[in-house]
């Protein structure tokens, strides 16, 4: 089983990782710095997301140090590139704790990276806030675990709940669904949730397959789905797969009534630039969009700072997917340190579990299993994208409509899919 397999990896996996220390903005604080260690995907398929998260974290670090640090000490981030390779993760966290002897650790990005860290974290008894990772703690049930992903108390179905709710509300209601997923931890979890949502709404599953993560040709998969003739298609995929799926669907002129769901990558500017109008009609999850009702105290100031530095840092120019969340999840740890006046993992975990935190993405409260007490997962539809669309298009809301949840809804779905093409 995936989660158990990674417990056997050791420090040797770090050999290929790259250590980097973020600069400190303040030097006036006394004492040794408080060190916070983590792995982040800075190369490999998830680098476009990992790099923007890192910049968000570095901005937090600089802001904290400019105000005097924490507990009268400066803060220093200590991080390794996990290369989007789960096998590096146990070794990285072992080295951070046993060799680098960091004061605290924080989680990596993505389910496939967070899960293999858990045995090390649990053995060491460390508080562990991860960035995005779907249902990572479902089997471990570790009481010091917290997830910044807004998937809520029932994480697996949350990624596609809005997708299925939207489909079920159409008249006539679609009857059949195809489910397709990469054979990887996140995609399998999301697709398990999609099955739950399909059953909830009485959809008949006519296609349910997984494909190898190394797949590059998605035309045969799309043809197989076409042959099953589903009304709607839910896809659970990672970035390069998502791009390949969108291209294959358009190249084959496939037009189900609704398509999308849990496709990682479509949120990133680099992939939106690549796909442009091919995205029209797709319905997919987002975790934050620049809508007025999702702008909180500090949101605009953060993104102004992030975007002014993005080009020099070689990261996503907008940072909407993970830049803000990178800032938010480490700010929770920082606020807990300040409130408890402590670096004790037990005290920090107890405080985090009981407290509602104010972040640049709004107030966040954790519930059972360290998941959000209430889901904040969005489903949006892309539409009206013209050839040559670029960053000024992606900067705003004209090309996307929030369909769910109701408190963030900005419009209604264009249905069926071909009407938005």
Regions found by a protein language model. Give the residues of each.
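Extracellular/periplasmic periplasmic-binding protein-like sensory domains
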Residues: 150, 249-327, 338, 394, ...
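Extracytoplasmic "Venus flytrap"
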Residues: 33-58, 80-87, 109-110, 180-189, ...
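Extracytoplasmic ligand/sensor domains, especially the bilobed periplasmic-binding protein
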Residues: 102-208, 257-284
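Solvent-exposed, acidic/polar segments of extracytosolic/periplasmic ligand-binding ectodomains
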Residues: 34, 353-421
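Signal peptide-proximal N-terminal region
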Residues: 29-31, 55-77, 168-169, 199-202
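Hydrophobic alpha-helical segments within soluble ligand-binding/sensing domains
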Residues: 89, 149-173, 217-219, 242, ...
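Short, low-complexity disordered leader/linker segments with a strong preference
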Residues: 1-35, 415-421
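Beta-alpha junction/loop-to-helix N-cap segments that form part of ligand/metal-binding clefts
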Residues: 35, 48-55, 68-140, 148, ...
């Amino acid at each position: 089983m995936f989660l158990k397999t990674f417990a056997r990896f050791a420090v040797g996996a770090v050999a290929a990782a790259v250590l980097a220390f973020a600069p400190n903005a303040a030097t006036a604080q006394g004492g040794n710095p408080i060190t916070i260690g983590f792995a982040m995907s800075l190369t490999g398929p998830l680098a476009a997301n990992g790099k923007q998260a890192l910049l968000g974290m570095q901005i937090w670090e600089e802001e904290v140090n400019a105000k005097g640090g924490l507990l009268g000490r400066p803060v220093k981030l200590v991080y390794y590139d996990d290369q989007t390779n789960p096998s590096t993760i146990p070794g990285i966290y072992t080295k951070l704790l046993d060799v680098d002897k960091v004061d605290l650790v924080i989680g990596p990005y993505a389910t496939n990276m967070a899960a293999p860290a858990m045995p090390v974290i649990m053995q060491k008894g460390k508080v562990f806030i991860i960035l995005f990772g779907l249902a990572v703690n479902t089997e471990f049930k570790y009481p010091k675990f917290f997830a910044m992903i807004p998937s809520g108390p029932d994480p697996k179905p949350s990624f596609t709940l809005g997708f299925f709710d939207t489909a079920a509300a159409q008249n006539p209601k679609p009857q059949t669904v195809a489910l397709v997923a990469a054979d990887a931890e996140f995609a399998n979890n999301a697709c398990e949730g999609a099955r739950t949502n399909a059953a909830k709404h009485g959809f008949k599953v006519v296609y349910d397959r997984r494909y190898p993560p190394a797949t590059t040709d998605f035309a045969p998969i799309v043809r197989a789905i076409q042959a099953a003739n589903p009304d709607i298609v839910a896809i659970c995929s990672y970035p390069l797969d998502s791009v390949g799926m969108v291209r294959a669907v358009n190249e084959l002129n496939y037009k189900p009534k609704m398509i999308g769901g849990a496709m990682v990558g479509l949120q990133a500017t680099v992939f939106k630039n690549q796909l442009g109008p091919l995205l029209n009609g797709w319905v997919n999850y987002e975790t934050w969009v620049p809508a007025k009702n999702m702008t909180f105290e500090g949101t605009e100031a953060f993104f102004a700072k992030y975007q002014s530095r993005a080009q020099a840092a070689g990261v996503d120019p907008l940072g909407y997917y993970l830049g803000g969340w990178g800032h938010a999840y480490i700010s929770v740890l920082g606020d807990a340190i300040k409130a408890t006046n402590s670096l004790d993992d037990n005290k920090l975990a107890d405080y985090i579990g009981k407290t509602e935190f104010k972040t640049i993405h709004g107030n966040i409260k954790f519930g059972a299993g360290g998941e959000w007490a209430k889901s904040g997962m969005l489903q949006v539809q892309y539409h009206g994208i013209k050839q040559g669309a670029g960053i000024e298009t992606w900067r705003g809301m004209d090309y996307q409509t929030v369909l769910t949840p109701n408190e963030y809804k900005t419009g209604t779905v264009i249905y069926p899919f071909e009407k938005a093409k």
